[in-house]
Amino acid sequence: MGLSTLEQKLTEMITAPVEALGYELVGIEFIRGRTSTLRIYIDSEDGINVDDCADVSHQVSAVLDVEDPISVAYNLEVSSPGLDRPMFTADHYARFQGEEVALVLRMAVQNRRKWQGIIKAVDGEMITVTVEGKDEVFALSNIQKANLVPHF
């Protein structure tokens, strides 16, 4: 998935502190608005609880206060990926091969920006998703947003 320059810089800046605490940095989102939000997703083999989120928030806040990479006021949110886990990297798609995913594309493919189907394969920077019985191939750089679709 194509990250913005700011998101790339933030990812580079906070990966080491998050991993030093024993967590995986799943990904980040910076949402601009009246009140901007920096959302950080973390995970671990044992799952994530509120204390884990607080620990990461404290550590990341200290790094961001020193580096000051964001020029606007923002709220920091740290959470687990949840059931509708966001997908950020080729590794995420490979890890959840066989699962259902909802995609929003930056540029339409076949006049559609929204797609939903089963992750079939990952090949470098391309993913294959089976949509209504037909395989569709998408460039990760064209995926604006992707989430697993939970089934209950």
Swiss-Prot record:
Keyword tags: Cytoplasm, Ribosome biogenesis
GO CC entries: cytosol
Source superkingdom: Bacteria
InterPro entries noted in UniProt: Ribosome_maturation_RimP, RimP_C, RimP_C_sf, RimP_N, RimP_N_sf
Coiled-coil ranges per UniProt: none
Subcellular location: Cytoplasm
Biological process annotations from GO: ribosomal small subunit assembly; translation
Family: Belongs to the RimP family.
Function: Required for maturation of 30S ribosomal subunits.
Protein name (database record): Ribosome maturation factor RimP
Upper taxonomic lineage: Bacteria, Pseudomonadati, Pseudomonadota, Gammaproteobacteria, Enterobacterales
Gene designation per UniProt: rimP
